[in-house]
Amino acid sequence: MNLLQDQPAMGIDQTTLEHLARQWEDLAPEAILAEAVRCFGDKLVLASAFGPESIILLDMLVKVWPRPQAFFLETGFHFPETLALKDRVLARFPQLQLEVVGPLMSVAQQNAIYGERLHDRNPDHCCAIRKVEPLNRALAPYKAWIAGMRREQSPTRGQIGVVQWDSRRGMVKFNPLATWTHKQVWAYIVERDLPYNPLHDEGFPSIGCSPLNCTAPVADGADPRSGRWRGKAKTECGLHA
């Protein structure tokens, strides 16, 4: 458990974290979060789009971090239900220090430069403008971040470690819920009576931006992320891949 603490942040590399991930594979998420807070303090941040996983992580974090830090990427295309949930979460966790980070250009500016419905014609470019660049800016002050990724969510996430090296940004990334199942997530939500997006009750297991070609409902038993970028080869927005 002391491997991170024993090395300066600049000395942590992929090999170190792969070893640590194997050691931590069976640790409870709360223990991983406690270690992350102990090692990185105010250089640690939670990425939250207010999915159930990030709300669970926040509920766990407040037990070990008096004023947890998080950021929310305001793409300009969120469902109204997502924005309403943000307010409910802030009311539930008033100690949360939330930074709202937006793109460098408004939706109107993007439409003027690239034309309307860029998300339909070139979703990678739209995600780069509205998600990836803001994410990189949001993470710049930090040395480590926490995400709600789970292996069960999609094949592209099937090999993630509970802790890993984010080589793109040169920092540590924690995935404390990597081993959790869909059933575990919702059992925790119910047990703790946590707020969640009502769209989950309407067939949306994975919620991103509101255009239906970016986020659509899926059939029972289908891949939870199959409603994202429907009809496209795209499987990730670029935040985690």
UniProtKB/Swiss-Prot annotation:
Kindly list the GO molecular function terms attached to this UniProt entry: phosphoadenylyl-sulfate reductase (thioredoxin) activity
Pathway note:
Sulfur metabolism; hydrogen sulfide biosynthesis; sulfite from sulfate: step 3/3
Gene3D superfamilies in UniProt: HUPs (3.40.50.620)
Show the catalytic activity. Answer: [thioredoxin]-disulfide + sulfite + adenosine 3',5'-bisphosphate + 2 H(+) = [thioredoxin]-dithiol + 3'-phosphoadenylyl sulfate
Enzyme Commission no: 1.8.4.8
List GO BP terms, alphabetically: hydrogen sulfide biosynthetic process; sulfate assimilation, phosphoadenylyl sulfate reduction by phosphoadenylyl-sulfate reductase (thioredoxin)
SUPFAM superfamilies tied to this protein? Adenine nucleotide alpha hydrolases-like
Q: Which CDD domains match?
A: PAPS_reductase
What keywords would UniProt list here?
Cytoplasm, Oxidoreductase
Please name the InterPro entries in this protein's record.
Answer: PAPS/APS_Rdtase, PAPS_reduct_dom, Rossmann-like_a/b/a_fold
Q: Where is this region: Disordered?
A: 221-241
**Entry's localization field:** Cytoplasm
Task: Determine the domain of life of the protein's source.
Answer: Bacteria
Q: Where is the active site?
A: C237 (nucleophile)
Q: What single Pfam family name could you report for this chain, choosing any that match?
A: PAPS_reduct
Q: Name one GO cellular component term.
A: cytoplasm
Q: Which family does it belong to?
A: Belongs to the PAPS reductase family. CysH subfamily.
> What job does the chain carry out?
Catalyzes the formation of sulfite from phosphoadenosine 5'-phosphosulfate (PAPS) using thioredoxin as an electron donor.
Q: What is this protein called?
A: Phosphoadenosine 5'-phosphosulfate reductase
Q: Which organism is it from?
A: Gloeobacter violaceus (strain ATCC 29082 / PCC 7421)
Q: Which gene encodes it?
A: cysH
